[in-house]
Amino acid sequence: MDQGYYLSQSVEIPVGASLYIEPGVTVTCKSEVQVPVEIVVLGNLYCLGTAEKPVIFTSDTRKPADWGGIICGYNSEEVVLNHVDVAYAGATPTESSASFQNKLFKTTIDGGVPAFHFCNVNGKFVMANSFFHDNYNDQTYFTGGNGVIINNIFADSGNAADGGEAINVKAGCKLDVANNIIYNACTNAFKLSNAGNSEVIPLSEMTVYNNTIVNCGWRRSKNKKGGSVWVEKAAKPVFVNNLIYDSRFGLKQPKKDGADMEHSRLTPNYYFASTETGVAQMAKDAELGIWFDTDIKSSVAGQLNPLFKSFKQSEKMNINCEIDDVAGCSIGIRKELEFRLSGRQSCSLRRCNRFCPPLPTRSAILRHEAGEFPG
């Protein structure tokens, strides 16, 4: 019988200690508490789920911002999240919160925490085969670490007032991000930045490819600075062979302090829009947009539809809607929805596929699947 744990207060994993969570375990966080529940990882965390028996972090009322998140410390050496569901996180900490007491993520109380945060420049993490959904702020936020983010689903992140990215990256990271589905991120699927760079925090190196980005950006009602991918503060990612589908904007950067264009690789990618508004907002003359002739883009509404196997867009889709539960808003996602391609555009997508990076860090996933992790 699978085990379940009910948390009414935060759990703190000490420096040097490791917590292993076995397949099928469900951790339910109580929502009606004075100090939001958090999982603070000062040591190591290994969530070792399987496809049949994922590890689940949820809440008792199943509402966004019911609990904090998984917040890792500056000495956290290794974290593995394999076949893990993380939902309803993003609560605002208090001065009594474990993350705040350990000076992690928030040094002032001015908003919620992400569902998963990693910050050790020398640490390692793996996120694989996991499902992050209905989290009130960013799904993930990285200010350091060497990580692999592969084969995950990130759905329904953020809130209209404060935004919320699926994958938010600052300086200090070396990341390999591939084969993820990002659906309905409030602001961007990816926010890629070198904010925080210093003598001890190096510039980030990011390789982002073969990801599917669907319906992102439409809920952001304030500071509309993104809608699929935002690159700033001299970030220099490799961002290629990604599919961006019906998101509010295409690739963007600020007027000042934008991407390091000389050292980035930001094309080819595939952009589809089912509406004329979508076509206009990712066009060559779109404000703050980054344009490449080598990308594949819809030039009229509905052109180059990738034809997903079991996902069908709402006929009333309005990528500037900004409000949930009205005509034109994005439909909810089911974990079993297939975003694999079923139709004739697969050949066009393969035209983008000119990138096969080495992935030495993926060996960590293979070691875990073989029962050898950690080494």
Where do the protein language model's features map onto the residues?
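Extracellular beta-rich repeat passengers
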Residues: M1-E22, V27-G375
